[in-house]
């Protein structure tokens, strides 16, 4: 709430902050009330002892004081727990209760003095030990309470409190000159107060001119940021809790929406179809990522002995002590003759720690050339090393490790980069620009780079490349230093780990992508804070405080695991009403105009290391490890502070190092993320990526049997998850890796005996499932197509992230021509392991049908007649089977294949080759365009003797083809040939294999004005397969692929 006003002055404490102090004092006074009552009324005193009589009189008076304190503290507790954060009317009488409690405190102070007098007179001469001990305890307790209250008053004292009250009273009247004078006085007083706090914070450091300037600049920055803001520190804590709950609620709401492209949230960042994962299967990409991990060791070493001991608290101290000359051998030289060390401590611990860091990592080819431990405002420590293995000269800059570094961080105004000959406005973080200029000046004065490149001419150090690295403050300084050094070193590279968010202007940020690679881990706070980001954060914080109707103590306690209940308002209408009614109560909080800060962004191309959040297990169960992924981040996406307990922990340098390594570990274990139109990874926020793939076998539905060979398709009616689910709640039932119902073993075996293609795919799917389990691949499902959703309808579940298009016509098996039997199969999964190519499996199994090529030409199979007559839409599969059985007994039954001369064929048939290419084309991930006929009207190759060409099209087909000519973006992609297929990506890349609009929305290609039967007839994809040899004009089997 706003600061409480007592004695006509505002204090930096709210009336709802007194709950815990009042409870503590109430319990303390209650305890002493019970003890003193037992001592006074339960013991017998000697009437001849003066000390005992004085104790009884003093104790009775103190009992009354204790009783008064208890009553006043109960009233404070009751009042403090009423109302909301900004709803202060129920607590208006708090100041009067405090007046009463302070009056009682004065009486306590008098009784404490009387107790001291009694102790000086009777403590040595009194023989009653009980009386002496009780009196001594009361006196000590009284003085502890009094001193605590005095210290609290000093802490919550606001020097500008009187001016603030006057300004608020004046603002209620018409604005005049007095209002502006009071506002100016308030801002100056706040700046002076902040400057005083900074000086107290840095009381042990020597003050220089630059440091004094930093004090003034940061003080005015804080005064500007908290101007006219009537909140107390506890309000910020409660606001953070509410803001975190709001962010989580928004993410869940986004996942519940049907009209968005967000598949999941990893580390608070949305994952969409356009999210680019690092393709670690690409050798060039893998080498680049390993280079990023390698140079993180140089950035970590720059922190010297504090970080070395933090990483190795036990053996690290022994390693440093063994190398320190001041501890063991003062006369022993510690470094090579060419090493320069500036302003290290007497033992040289920082330089020794840097050296030990590389030795522990077996990096013996790294030579330290120069080490500067000089630490001041705008002057950051750094070191220069030569890496002979990589043939690089490395400049590593230390991050924030001292209060002086914090002053450099807080000087966040925009400063022009001292670089000439560029286009646009290049601005940077002022503190880091000054630090980069200092390092550049130091390198030139000491000729450090000349020494490094001339370190060992025999090894060719003259031709080594230059690398600049840093973490946190060092990352921002390294990026700006790269701007200053790039004119002399055009091949320079920079690696910035956890850089600050408000670092570079947009023009400079775009240019830095040519040579800067930045790394951000998870929900790290630092890459998301700058002046512009903090201003937006302040507005969000005030907004959640305005909308909150709960008491502050309940909000803060609700953030703990004891009471994990959301304190966000449930009824949005009620919240809006309450907020509008409180608008006039605190207008200064709600109408604050944000300052016009120049937007600054993180530098370079950003590698964002994200991870999922496994469900919390019970205390007796082992917690699962999160799975880490690396994606390419957008510099402008880090514009919002994500509130999380990990936002500070994930900024530590050794935690960043662990996160980078875990990406490689997960990749080596086979934990990749691959999404396509028919293969969708379950959201890592819901399902932990573990090797255990749980297949839930569900019973078949009751009803009439389906036609032979028709794959079972049931409606997928599950709703999209709205919150993070546990692993058991997110287990998927798979049918050949398709989301839907699972065929029973008997039904699967029966279908396999009748259909060789289904037999082939069933064995392939089993092998793929076993290998995916052994490779710890992520759970993957194929989007099922229910009989209540069209071919272009995607279920909007959280596990897939697709949007659902409701109300489309039901899908039935509608045949347009009197052709052969239909094979209804599920498409194979895009190969993630090259050894499991669906094309390879098909070609190997084609030996079963090689006899068709040897004994029966394609012309005989197709027949020499014209186009087969069209079949009425009302025809069923049973009628077709009956017709097929009456047309000559030479036609082999469906699914029955004979062997040629008792052996298998040696090469596949052209029809199976075409079918294999079609299967591969379903999972084409390239960006080529296609016509409608390329995928929806696939025919057999034209033959000079075959009349099986394009037959007359129905009106529905002609209208669709005509529409596809004018709307080329609505058609699927072309089939991808196996030989020219792109390398599989290890990142999530969803191929838009279904029609999309210009806005990314899924569209229905069904022409208007057609019946459902005619529309569904166009959804069939045909390819021809021979049904046997020795048959006269044979019916062509339609192979309908249901992408599920």
UniProtKB/Swiss-Prot annotation:
The keyword Membrane applies. The active site is at 472 (charge relay system), 524 (charge relay system). Its cofactor is Ca(2+). Its EC number is 3.1.1.116. Residues 848-897, 1013-1044 are annotated as: Disordered. Gene3D superfamilies: alpha/beta hydrolase. Residues 1-22, 82-101, 158-1044 are cytoplasmic. Changing residue 975 to C: Abolishes interaction with HOMER1. Does not affect enzymatic activity. Fails to associate with the plasma membrane. Glycans are attached at residue 133. It is an enzyme of class 3 (hydrolase). GO terms for molecular function: hydrolase activity; metal ion binding; monoacylglycerol lipase activity. GO terms for cellular component: dendritic spine membrane; early endosome membrane; plasma membrane; postsynaptic density membrane; postsynaptic membrane; varicosity. It is a multi-pass membrane protein. SUPFAM superfamilies: alpha/beta-Hydrolases. It is found in: Cell membrane; Cell projection, Dendritic spine membrane; Postsynaptic density membrane; Early endosome membrane. Disruption phenotype: Deficient mice are viable, fertile and display normal physiological behaviors. Deficient mice show 80-90% reductions in brain 2-AG as well as the downstream product arachidonic acid (AA), in particular in neurons and astrocytes. The endocannabinoid-mediated retrograde synaptic suppression of neurotransmitter release is absent in the cerebellum, hippocampus, and striatum of knockout mice. In addition, reduction in adult neurogenesis is observed in deficient mice in both the hippocampus and the subventricular zone. DAGLA deletion increases anxiety-like and depressive behaviors. GO terms for biological process: arachidonate metabolic process; cannabinoid biosynthetic process; diacylglycerol catabolic process; monoacylglycerol biosynthetic process; neuroblast proliferation; neurogenesis; regulation of neuroinflammatory response; retrograde trans-synaptic signaling by endocannabinoid. Disulfide bonds: none annotated. CDD domains: Lipase_3 (cd00519). Belongs to the AB hydrolase superfamily. Lipase family. Serine hydrolase that hydrolyzes arachidonic acid-esterified diacylglycerols (DAGs) to produce the principal endocannabinoid (eCB), 2-arachidonoylglycerol (2-AG). Preferentially hydrolyzes sn-1 fatty acids from diacylglycerols (DAG) that contain arachidonic acid (AA) esterified at the sn-2 position to biosynthesize 2-AG. Has negligible activity against other lipids including monoacylglycerols and phospholipids. Plays a key role in regulating 2-AG signaling in the central nervous system (CNS). Controls the activity of 2-AG as a retrograde messenger at neuronal synapses. This is Diacylglycerol lipase-alpha. It comes from Mus musculus (Mouse). The lineage of its organism: Eukaryota, Metazoa, Chordata, Craniata, Vertebrata. The gene is Dagla.
